Design a protein with these regions (language model features):
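Periplasmic/ER-lumenal interhelical loops and adjacent helix-loop junctions
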Residues: 46-47, 195, 203-279, 464, ...
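Signature aromatic-anchored transmembrane alpha helix within multi-pass, membrane-resident enzymes
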Residues: 101, 182, 199, 343-372, ...
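Aromatic-rich transmembrane-lumenal/periplasmic boundary elements in polytopic membrane proteins
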Residues: 11-51, 194-241, 401-425, 430
């Protein structure tokens, strides 16, 4: 039985490996929003107390701490692969819990749906690796909450704390975890527990938002730029229902840019519809099915004219609601229900031998109708190597950290040594001990989306105007980095550079020293201390939950003579 129980996790591992295989090569993940560097540091930006909204906390803090021990490139690639594996394995375990009659065939279908879908492909191409880590935790959260229904000991809550903390690498991940946990809960005690743990996991960005320089209202242009998008032959609703509809048309696999997208969508929705009918008749997973429907319909409505108007009002009038503008990311909430429904579809075939055949056909159809998810989404996601000069410049700045301005000032870059023709976030802010001043302005599908960095925008204007060094120093800038071979509007910034001492220069990058005295722009020590304390609450939740998970798993294996089907720290009851 133990060998049979290993089939779903090994199958999920194979699928995750098929997707992330190119990242096994030496180098760093660098694609659009995904940036990994050899080292990261606990800067104001990493803590979420800079000018920008705390969108990447506690992720950046965690990476900064862990890169003391592990190279950042290795760490991020491992976490991404782990997130996909957890999605598939967790979906299989959730299916085994809710529809045990589906057996191994059903678990394999569930794992396939969780990993092999347009949501994963499009978020990979957008570089949302940490969102995918949270996505991978969703079925585990649902499974753990379901098993809490009959738990009597406090230790049974430890796995839930662990999974919500892992999902909470990003603010969006915490919200996803909270919604899935509440949907899976059936009693008040479980709902209160899910809410309490989610609040603790959210402490880093809640405290950072409360104590930051400001929680900026969103830019109205961003609502249209980040709205869910219709894919060929599907419309917006069909795209979202098939787990696609990414706002960025460039971050879409080739198979979703033609009418071939309709083929995968039909296959997926037939499998899910058959299984959903089985679940409905059995009164199973109704909460998960409910949020799946909402996760498809609500973003579709928000992408309409009235929906865009409502979203614009919300994010411009209510600070902190910018998290709502990317409507398609909430489709992740549909994955647990889709996976369980896929498993339940197997039950419609009564003969066990026929169930294996049906499951095999379903898995093959899903994979072959989205063929370019394999091998790094058709080879577009690869590991890159930084030029040697970048490390030298980082070493100079880290030896004497002062805020840094970067030329060209655009937020996104295109490097000849980077992923071919794919824009990427500037990696430099995550590589140095000092904060980088930047406006954060973006241009998305012809829309100019204003960022949060007021000081950064002022510094960019000074550089474009060829301002004197003392004006940069008055804004706290101690270094200027000029990156070669990446497009951008530098205007007459060369006038400013000509007045600065060159600390380093090669064909790829140059570093200039701005003479002091510099106006300090760091966050007050008290604010940093409070936000660090909030991050430590999240770390404690993660560590305590993780230790309890390992201890309970060890106890279960010892108690069963080491022959029990592998699980991750669950309460003794499977009801």
């Amino acid at each position: 039985m133990r060998r049979i129980g290993l089939i779903p996790p090994l199958y999920a591992l194979a699928l995750a490996a098929a997707v992330t295989a190119p990242l096994a090569a030496p180098g760093y993940l660098l694609i659009r929003d995904a940036v990994s560097t050899p080292r990261s540091y606990v800067t104001d930006a990493a803590l979420g107390v800079g000018e920008a909204a705390p969108r990447a906390v506690p992720q950046d803090f965690f990476i900064a701490v862990m890169t003391v021990l592990v190279d950042g490139g290795v760490l991020v690639k491992m976490l991404l692969a782990l997130g996909l594996w957890l999605a598939g394995w967790g979906a299989a375990r959730l299916a085994a819990q809710l529809v045990p009659a589906a057996g191994i065939p059903g678990e394999l279908v569930a794992a396939t749906i969780a990993i092999w879908n347009p949501y994963v492909a499009e978020r990979l191409l957008q570089g949302h690796w940490s969102l995918l880590v949270g996505y991978g935790c969703l079925p585990w959260i649902a499974l753990t909450v379901i098993r809490l229904r009959t738990a009597t000991n406090l230790g049974a809550w430890c796995p839930l704390a662990f999974w919500i903390a892992v999902a909470g690498l990003t603010p969006t991940g915490t919200v996803l975890a909270l919604i899935v946990g509440l949907a899976a809960a059936t009693d008040r005690r479980s709902r209160v527990g899910v809410l309490a743990i989610s609040v603790l996991a959210a402490m880093p960005w809640l405290v950072a938002s409360g104590l930051g320089a400001a929680v900026p209202a969103g830019d109205a242009a961003g609502v249209h730029a980040f709205a869910a998008r219709a894919e060929p032959g599907l419309g917006t609703l069909g795209s979202l229902a098939s787990l696609g509809g990414m706002w960025n048309a460039s971050a879409v696999p080739a198979s979703r840019t033609t009418l071939f997208a309709l083929v995968f969508s039909v296959v997926l929705l037939i499998v899910v519809a058959v299984g959903a009918a089985v679940l409905w008749r059995a009164r199973k997973a109704l909460g998960l099915l409910g949020i799946a429907v909402a996760a498809v319909i609500i973003p579709a409505l928000l992408a309409t004219g009235p929906g865009l108007t409502l979203t614009t009002w919300l994010i411009t009038e209510v600070p902190g609601l910018g998290i709502l503008r990317d409507g398609q990311k909430w489709v992740a909430l549909a994955m647990p229900a889709y996976a369980v429904a896929g498993a339940a579809a197997v039950i419609a075939v009564r003969e066990r031998s026929s169930q294996y055949l049906a499951a095999g056909l379903a898995c093959a159809a899903l994979i072959f109708t989205l063929p370019d998810l394999a091998w790094g989404v058709g080879g577009r996601m690869t590991a890159v190597k930084y030029p040697s000069g970048w490390n030298a410049v980082a070493a100079h700045i880290n030896a004497d950290p002062h805020p840094v301005a970067v030329l060209p000032p655009e937020t996104m870059r295109q490097y000849p040594w980077g992923p071919s023709s794919i824009p990427v976030l500037d990696p430099f802010p995550r590589w140095i001990r000092a904060d980088t001043v930047s406006s954060g302005d973006l241009r998305v599908d012809g829309h100019d989306v204003r960022g949060d960095g007021t000081r950064g925008r002022q510094v960019e204007e000074l550089l474009r105007a060829g301002a004197a060094p003392r004006e940069l120093a008055a804004h706290g800038v101690g270094w200027v980095v000029a990156q070669a071979d990446t497009p951008g509007q530098q205007a007459v910034s060369s006038k400013t550079l000509a007045q600065l001492d060159t600390a380093y220069r090669d064909g790829d990058i140059a570093l200039y020293r701005v003479p002091g005295p510099w106006n300090p722009i760091a966050a007050p020590p008290g604010r940093r201390a409070a936000v660090i304390a909030a991050h430590l609450v999240w770390i404690a939740l993660l560590a305590a939950g993780g230790v309890a998970v390992l201890r309970r798993q060890h106890t279960r294996q010892v108690g069963s003579g080491g022959t029990q089907d592998p699980k991750i720290c669950t309460p003794d009851s499977d009801n």
